[in-house]
Amino acid sequence: MSAPQAFIVADHVCKSFGTHQVLRDVSTHFSTGEVTVIIGASGSGKSTLLRAINRLEPHDSGTITIDGVPVTDDAATLQKQRCEVGMVFQQFNLFGHLSVLDNVTLAPRRVRRTARAQANEQAMLLLRRVGLQDHAHKYPWQLSGGQQQRVAIARALAMQPKVMLFDEPTSALDPEMVQEVLDVMRELARGGMTMIVVTHEMGFARE
């Protein structure tokens, strides 16, 4: 059996905000099919590393590559890389004026030019996967925090990414809603999804 291939590689990455250096000469890699959990104190650069991978927070020096291609400001390359790397944030960032279904289908239709019927079919499969198929025509304000975060996961999966980044996905949730989101993440991990997770949920991290 061949060893997992490094899909994302960080090499001597540095990032500062003013005089505060958040990422200091970080070198690491994340392999296909693996789940990596990043833990540490607040302000230690965990979320910044995730955002640097997606170029949401450009790094100052060093290199980050995704599938061998450097992460830079080249628009065409960056769009392709962002399609391959899905991200789920602390806040759900759903569009309040769009239904759950339209939130999930928006990016495939706009970016991948997927036909509406095909995008809707794919979205319903994903909503079923996260247990929300019966809520497809509701709006975000009609859902609980846990349900909104599960929609956010389905939305990220709709782009058919090769890697999923989770930036403290349960930190903004009430305690009783945390488990439903972690259950979806466990299901993704069991399915072989490559995942990089920043979390304070130590029980999930130990798994």
Predicted regions located by residue number:
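ABC family nucleotide-binding domain
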Residues: 6-10, 14-207
